């Protein structure tokens, strides 16, 4: 099913920068009202004011830490109390860590799993009935090309994104013919603040795409008559992901380890 933008409402997590902010801009340009969620209230307000003035859409800002239990129901109830129903959900919030597992901080690992996996599932479950009732929008979960193979040096991050890909493709099948477009977006290295958290651009492999290119890939997929369950952004990334799925597992792990050995 193709997307409806004008007059609908899109909820975007991790909206204060990077892919989240780009999704917000491109949806607003198409006439979507927005709910922007992230921890940084000042960044959200700045973005919201810009989008309101440029596109004349309604933008609701909800500063919130998503990395805790029950956040899906909390977010849903907060919007219901404001009379806001959601047509499109974009689960973009997440972060990655970089380095051998034995050197990782256990609390950071727990936070990474909570935000990248638990919060995404919780928010999806909370809003899915409303998304299905609307039938005019989409569920977009941001995965990664890291989902296609284990990555020594990014073991936890890669595993969380493999979960997101598997989970989203399953939900896409469960909801087929419902009118809801369900998509796992798998970008490769992208020019965002993600790498500030990860440990610098030395962790990136190959030429980075821009946020605009990645979001453009998602919108193109959502515009298809039959939206695929997942899409990889960038032809080099598509080729690499394809090889990762066809080569022996031990080979893909060794290649991935070499690709991130700069740390």
Q: What spans do the regions from the language model cover?
A:
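Conserved glycine-rich cofactor-binding loop
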Residues: 9, 16-17
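Conserved glycine-rich Rossmann-like NAD(P)H-binding loop of the short-chain dehydrogenase/reductase
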Residues: 30-47
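Conserved NAD(P)H cofactor-binding loop of Rossmann-fold oxidoreductase domains
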Residues: 92-97
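Substrate-binding pocket helix/loop in short-chain dehydrogenase/reductase
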Residues: 100-113
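Active-site helix of classical SDR
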Residues: 124, 160
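Residue(s) in the substrate-gating loop at a strand-loop-helix junction
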Residues: 144
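SDR active-site lid
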Residues: 166, 172-236, 245, 249
């Amino acid at each position: 099913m193709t997307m409806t933008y004008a007059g609908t409402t899109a909820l975007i997590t991790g909206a204060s920068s990077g892919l989240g902010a780009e999704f917000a801009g491109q949806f607003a340009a198409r006439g979507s009202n927005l709910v922007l969620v992230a921890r940084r209230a000042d960044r959200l307000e700045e973005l919201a004011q810009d989008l309101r003035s440029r596109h004349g859409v309604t933008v609701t800002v909800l500063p919130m830490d998503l990395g805790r239990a029950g956040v899906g129901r909390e977010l849903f109830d907060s919007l219901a109390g404001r009379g806001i129903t959601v047509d499109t959900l974009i689960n973009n919030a997440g972060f990655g860590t970089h380095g051998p597992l034995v050197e990782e901080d256990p609390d950071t690992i727990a936070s990474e799993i909570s935000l990248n996996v638990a919060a995404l599932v919780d928010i999806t479950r909370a809003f899915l009935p409303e998304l299905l009732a609307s039938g005019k929008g989409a569920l977009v979960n941001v995965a990664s090309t890291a989902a296609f193979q284990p990555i020594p040096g990014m073991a936890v991050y890669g595993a969380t994104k493999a979960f997101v890909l598997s989970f989203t493709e399953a939900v896409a099948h469960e909801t087929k013919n419902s009118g809801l477009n369900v998509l796992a977006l798998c970008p490769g290295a992208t020019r965002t603040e993600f790498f500030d958290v990860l440990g610098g651009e030395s962790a990136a492999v190959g030429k980075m795409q821009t946020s605009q290119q990645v979001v453009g890939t998602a919108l193109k997929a959502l515009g298809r008559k039959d939206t695929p369950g997942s899409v990889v952004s960038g032809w080099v990334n598509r080729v690499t992901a394809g090889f990762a799925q066809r080569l022996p597992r031990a080979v893909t792990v060794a290649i991935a380890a070499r690709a991130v050995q700069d740390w």
